[in-house]
């Protein structure tokens, strides 16, 4: 790439002339015609004399100026330096010509195919005794490019034999890629990639000789100078030495700067031709660039080193119009070829200040910000522009935040010829799909045939291939400086996919404490290999008995949970997500917070993971989960339905998830069942595939856990036959258990014959289908009681009704307890009912492995009572054989006494104590009694000394009551006959005070008389 416009000026005089340096005329433009016609091309020429077609190859490019004169000689000091800056887009292509070697140039033997143009000038030569204005001509040749100079031309000004010898000048050309303060000071644009040309250290004399003998070095001054570049010069098939700008809206202004030897004077002047570039709307003006993407590997769902090539066809013949320069470029990558989070490993960013775009300062981007390489195929010369691609960061920003802001891509292509192309691109990912659109806007008018950008490959590649195989496409849209646009698509193929994309993940779990019932930390791991379908939903059922004490945690509020801004008081663990394709996914971690109700579940999780790594800070990715409870097994179910697969346009390609539940002060505790357990998970992919996983879970030393449940029961029933028939009997069952014992697995209880099931109520049982659909729709008569369960894992007790539920094929309906608690936690305890010989047996065979502080079952009397009574309960000894089995396997069997309430007051049938036997011996009444609860027994009568006896538990006891004086006297007289009052005061206020009476009388005297008669 190089630009036309070089002004030639011949060496000027060594003697100082009167007056100041001045430019009388300065013109630059592109002209038509042949070599003879172009010599007369000036601003005053008809417009038809100028070539104006945008992106065309002009026949000629010329620059010319005249200096002010005083008499026949120019004014001012001799020129030391001159510079010409031409319009952006006006390009000279040195590759169109052969190269004249420096030795050939010095010997005036440059080949004809190296000629780039000619010069024409008028000079004042101070030949001794014959100073005069001479008309001189010469040729311009293409010289080899040198380091720091992409354009080099030699100007051979022919002398006038035999007096004036030839003059050789070197015209150095360059590209203005950086801002230059000195140009800005005189109003000349810089950094816009226009070409400029300069002659330095202009000689001040020319050799004069006669008959081949050197006579002197004569000063000479240029009066007029014109340089003509042959725009159609070039080797066969490449006759495009000059190319016009593509912008019809920008002025075609060129700038001239002159500088003299001391005393230094400078002159600067712009010039704009009378006609501007036009023809941008020419339908024959070609503009069909393309973009193709080639993968380093075509393996699906893997990191890939992508090579993107933007190809711009060049039309190099003189009778052709060249491709217009690209102003804006948009390339949309194939769907599925997206950003790869693994790239963040060790990645840094290059700031705009470090790129130094528009500056000649060296690029200072960190090595760790390099994400690829770039090559630009231009004419300065081919394959000379190459460099690096960097991840960019906007100045003044603390981090790269992602959408709605684009990701920045910096390109730095350098050449040994001191040309630097520094571009800032933008990558916009689609927020929903991650599809990338890469844009480079306001590109320089720099002719190129190919721009090849290759991103790094390997496990940390910035891009990763699609998960699915098949043909995809790269779409592109380019706009030219002419205003034209062109778009299209090129194919992109991904291969290596199996017939069906697999969905086979692995799961593992660990717990920190092995002992049953111990507080523990629990870690859940889920891993997905490359090539598997992406994870969309996770539903995990924890091992039975692995539960946490929710009252210990402050639940996070809904607003804070949604925002991921919960406090530490709500944290119960940590989570780590490994994201990105390849062998080096990047881990991002964050806290796990316990929340209140979420999406209809009683509890939830808020898991904010801060997506900050390296130069990136995309903010929090907040994942939510529901926490439910299986109503039958009590197992905790954690379900994530909104598992993110993309965030701010970056597909996560989730590889591994690790969640650890741990909390200072203890939260989670182990099951108390040492049998084989498991964590069961159901996975659903984003494509709808499912997978079931199970990982074993076990605890030990269950036998070391104590198991001492306290079971009690009480009943009541009316003694009035009519009332009893109408309302039946009531039953209350209580169970108490200390903390840190083995949890209950099953309970089997048998009611005595005196408390049979009530047939009329059994017949009102709720049908199984109705109960399953909606218990509230069950017949009123099927609701026979209520239950309350207090557990340390919930802040509030579980409460709910007790239903009789009939099952098809079962002989008797079951008793089901429908318990609900905090935030809608529901637990269903099901018992199996069997009735034989009037004895009702209820079996709760599978109670959840959850600690229970207390359990109360109330089966009240009433029209729909579950039980009725046979006989006067207060006069009977009622027991309930009970078998309680622990989760650890320990079995407790007890004959649970059933206390009878409502037996206090006067009259018969008022006892919670039963008299088993009585006798008088040694002046004492010996009573054998049975109590049905702990309490105090009192025995009173005037014939007895009042006696009190305490018993710590229910049972059968012997009480010896001394006779009073009256009693002893009556015994001696054989006239002892009285009714003893036996009272019972229970220890528990829940029990009833009872009284029993027994008649005491003796007939010893009669018996003795009978024996004597015999």
Task: Tell what function each PLM region has.
Residues 1-17:
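Sec-dependent, cleavable N-terminal signal peptides
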Residues 3, 82, 329, 538, ...:
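Residue-level detector of buried hydrophobic side-chain packing
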Residues 16-908, 1000, 1007, 1011-1014:
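Ser/Thr/Pro/Gly-rich, low-complexity intrinsically disordered stalk/linker tracts of secreted
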Residues 532, 741, 930-936:
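Short proline/glycine-enriched turn/loop motifs at strand-loop junctions of beta-rich domains
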Residues 566, 949-957:
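Short proline/glycine- and polar residue-rich coil/turn motifs
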Residues 913-916:
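Surface-exposed, proline-enriched loop/turn segments that connect beta strands in immunoglobulin-like
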Residues 983-1002:
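C-terminal tail/sorting-segment detector
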């Amino acid at each position: 790439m190089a630009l036309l416009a070089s002004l030639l000026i011949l060496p000027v005089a060594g003697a100082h002339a009167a007056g100041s340096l001045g430019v009388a005329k300065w013109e630059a433009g592109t002209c038509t015609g042949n070599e003879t016609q172009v010599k007369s091309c000036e601003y005053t020429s008809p417009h038809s004399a100028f070539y104006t077609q945008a992106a065309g190859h002009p026949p000629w490019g010329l620059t010319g100026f005249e200096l002010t004169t005083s008499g026949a000689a120019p004014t001012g000091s001799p020129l030391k330096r001159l510079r010409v800056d031409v319009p952006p887009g006006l390009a000279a292509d040195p590759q169109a010509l052969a190269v004249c070697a420096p030795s050939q140039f010095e010997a005036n033997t440059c080949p004809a195919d190296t000629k780039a143009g000619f010069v024409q000038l008028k000079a004042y030569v101070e030949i001794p005794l014959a100073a005069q204005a001479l008309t001189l001509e010469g040729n311009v040749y293409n010289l080899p490019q040198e380091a720091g100079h992409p354009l080099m031309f030699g100007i051979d000004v022919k002398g006038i034999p035999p007096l004036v010898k030839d003059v050789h000048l070197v015209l150095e050309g360059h590209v203005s890629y950086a801002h230059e303060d000195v140009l800005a000071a005189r109003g000349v644009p810089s950094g816009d990639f226009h070409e400029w040309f300069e002659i330095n250290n202009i000689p001040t004399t020319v050799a004069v000789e006669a008959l081949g003998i050197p006579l002197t070095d004569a000063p000479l001054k240029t009066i007029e100078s014109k340089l003509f570049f042959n725009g159609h010069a070039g080797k066969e098939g490449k006759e495009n030495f000059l190319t016009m700008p593509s912008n019809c809206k920008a002025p075609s202004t060129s700038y001239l700067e002159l500088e003299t030897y001391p005393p230094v004077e400078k002159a600067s002047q712009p010039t704009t031709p009378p006609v501007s570039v036009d023809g941008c709307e020419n339908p024959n003006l070609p503009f069909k660039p393309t973009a193709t993407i080639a993968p380093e590997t075509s393996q699906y769902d893997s990191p890939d080193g992508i090579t993107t090539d933007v190809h711009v066809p060049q039309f190099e013949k003189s009778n052709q119009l060249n491709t217009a320069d690209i102003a804006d470029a948009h390339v949309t990558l194939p769907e599925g070829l997206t950003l790869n989070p693994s790239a963040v490993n060790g990645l840094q960013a290059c700031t705009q200040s470090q790129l130094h775009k528009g500056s000649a300062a060296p690029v200072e981007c960190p090595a760790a910000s390099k994400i690829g390489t770039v090559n630009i195929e231009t004419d300065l010369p081919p394959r000379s522009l190459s460099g690096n691609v960097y991840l960019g960061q906007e100045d003044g920003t603390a981090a790269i935040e992602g959408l709605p802001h684009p990701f920045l891509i910096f390109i730095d292509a350098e050449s040994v010829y001191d040309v630097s192309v520094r571009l800032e691109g933008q990558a916009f990912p689609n927020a929903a799909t991650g599809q990338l659109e890469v844009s480079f806007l306001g590109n320089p008018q720099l002719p190129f045939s190919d721009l090849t950008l290759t991103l790094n490959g390997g496990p940390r590649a910035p891009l990763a291939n699609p998960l699915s195989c098949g043909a995809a496409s790269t779409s592109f849209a380019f706009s030219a400086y002419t205003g034209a646009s062109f778009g299209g698509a090129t194919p992109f193929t991904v291969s290596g996919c199996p017939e069906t994309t697999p969905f086979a993940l692995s799961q593992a779990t660990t717990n920190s404490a092995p002992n049953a019932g111990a507080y523990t930390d629990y870690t859940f791991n889920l891993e997905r290999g490359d090539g598997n379908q992406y994870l969309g939903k996770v539903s995990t059922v924890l091992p039975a008995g692995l539960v946490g004490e929710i009252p210990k945690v402050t639940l996070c509020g809904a607003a804070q949970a949604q925002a991921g801004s919960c406090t530490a008081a709500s944290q119960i663990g940590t989570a780590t997500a490994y994201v990105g394709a390849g062998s080096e996914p990047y881990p991002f971690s964050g806290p796990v917070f316990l929340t209140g109700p979420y999406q209809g579940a009683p509890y939830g999780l808020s898991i904010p993971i801060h997506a900050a790594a390296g130069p990136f800070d995309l903010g929090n990715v907040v994942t939510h989960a529901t926490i439910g409870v299986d109503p039958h097994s009590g197992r905790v179910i954690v379900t994530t339905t909104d598992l993110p697969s993309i965030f701010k346009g970056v597909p996560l390609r989730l590889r591994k998830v690790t969640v650890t539940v741990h909390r200072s002060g203890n939260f989670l505790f182990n099951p108390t069942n040492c049998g084989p357990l498991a964590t069961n998970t159901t996975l659903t992919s984003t494509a709808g595939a499912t997978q079931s996983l199970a990982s074993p879970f076990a605890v030990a030393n269950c036998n070391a856990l104590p198991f001492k449940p306290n079971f009690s029961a009480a009943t009541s029933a009316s003694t009035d036959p009519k009332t009893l028939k109408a309302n039946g009997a009531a039953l209350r069952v209580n169970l108490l258990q200390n903390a840190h014992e083995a949890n209950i697995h099953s309970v089997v209880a048998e009611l005595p014959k005196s408390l049979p099931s009530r047939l009329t109520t059994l017949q009102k049982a709720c049908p199984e289908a109705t109960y399953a659909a909606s218990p509230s729709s069950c017949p009123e008569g099927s609701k026979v009681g209520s239950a309350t369960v207090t557990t340390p894992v919930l802040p509030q007790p579980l409460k709910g009704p007790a239903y009789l539920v009939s099952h098809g094929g079962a002989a008797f309906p079951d008793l089901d307890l429908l318990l609900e608690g905090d935030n809608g936690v529901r637990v269903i305890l099901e018992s199996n009912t069997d009735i034989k010989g009037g004895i009702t047996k209820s079996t709760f065979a599978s109670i959840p492995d959850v600690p229970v502080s207390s359990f109360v079952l109330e089966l009240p009397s009433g029209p729909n009572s579950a039980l009725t009574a046979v006989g006067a309960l207060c006069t009977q000894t009622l027991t309930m054989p009970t078998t309680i089995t622990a989760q650890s396997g320990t079995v407790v069997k007890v004959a649970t006494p059933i206390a009878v309430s409502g037996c206090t007051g006067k009259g018969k049938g008022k006892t919670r104590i039963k008299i088993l036997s009585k006798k008088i011996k040694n002046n004492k009444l010996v009573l054998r009694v049975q109590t049905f609860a702990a309490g105090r027994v009192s025995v009173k009568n005037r014939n007895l000394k009042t006696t009190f006896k305490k018993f710590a538990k229910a049972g059968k006891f012997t009480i010896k009551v001394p006779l009073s004086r009256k009693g002893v006297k009556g015994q001696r007289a054989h006239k002892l006959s009285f009714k003893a009052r036996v009272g019972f005061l229970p220890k528990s206020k829940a029990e009833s005070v009872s009284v029993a009476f027994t008649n005491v009388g003796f007939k010893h005297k009669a018996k003795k008389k009978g024996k004597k008669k015999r």
